[in-house]
Amino acid sequence: MLDSANYTPRLKAVYRDTIRAALKEEFGYKNDMQIPRLDKIVLNIGCGAEAVRDSKKAKSAQADLTLIAGQKAMTTTAKKSIAGFRVREEMPLGAKVTLRGDRMYEFLDRLITIAMPRIRDFRGISGKSFDGRGNYAMGLKEHLVFPEIDFDKIDENWGMDIVIATTAQTDAEAKSLLKAFNMPFNS
């Protein structure tokens, strides 16, 4: 990312210049504040049993997620002890990061244009993963699709969850917003 004061991420400019007007026309909004926009993107890597056996796995996941997001990831810990899984309270189990503003648009741009085309046998993402309130959740089987991760230096292949929160009131509005960003839905 550039540190220039007048720098605007590509997708943010596209949203401002074309997507807002298209959505306003499509759904007939009377007020500009009704137009859906991206609120935040949450990335999560859960290490599960790997972190229970080796506490360094959660640190590795945190480092990888920090590289992918461009922002320091926080470690997620167990809320309570579960003896059957050998999990103790406050034991590190993964990492998560919340992206907002310019970093959010930069990440979405890299996800759509670079990471998704690198997924093996990729035929688009499901259009059914909306929560009913305009938010979209998806999962990746491996984090190696991001160019920030050096294939030779990783010790574990992590899957990750990506949640895209929008201000849309319905799933149709959110899907239309994400399609305008060229999100490759298969349905």
Curated annotation (Swiss-Prot):
Molecular function via GO: rRNA binding; structural constituent of ribosome; tRNA binding
Stated family: Belongs to the universal ribosomal protein uL5 family.
Alphabetical GO biological process terms: translation
InterPro entries given in the database record: Ribosomal_uL5 (IPR002132), Ribosomal_uL5_bac-type (IPR020930), Ribosomal_uL5_C (IPR031309), Ribosomal_uL5_CS (IPR020929), Ribosomal_uL5_dom_sf (IPR022803), Ribosomal_uL5_N (IPR031310)
UniProt name for this protein: Large ribosomal subunit protein uL5
GO CC, one annotated term: ribonucleoprotein complex
Record's keyword terms, sorted: Ribonucleoprotein, Ribosomal protein, RNA-binding, rRNA-binding, tRNA-binding
A Pfam family recorded for this sequence: Ribosomal_L5_C
Superkingdom classification of source: Bacteria
Subunit structure: Part of the 50S ribosomal subunit; part of the 5S rRNA/L5/L18/L25 subcomplex. Contacts the 5S rRNA and the P site tRNA. Forms a bridge to the 30S subunit in the 70S ribosome.
Stated role: This is one of the proteins that bind and probably mediate the attachment of the 5S RNA into the large ribosomal subunit, where it forms part of the central protuberance. In the 70S ribosome it contacts protein S13 of the 30S subunit (bridge B1b), connecting the 2 subunits; this bridge is implicated in subunit movement. Contacts the P site tRNA; the 5S rRNA and some of its associated proteins might help stabilize positioning of ribosome-bound tRNAs.
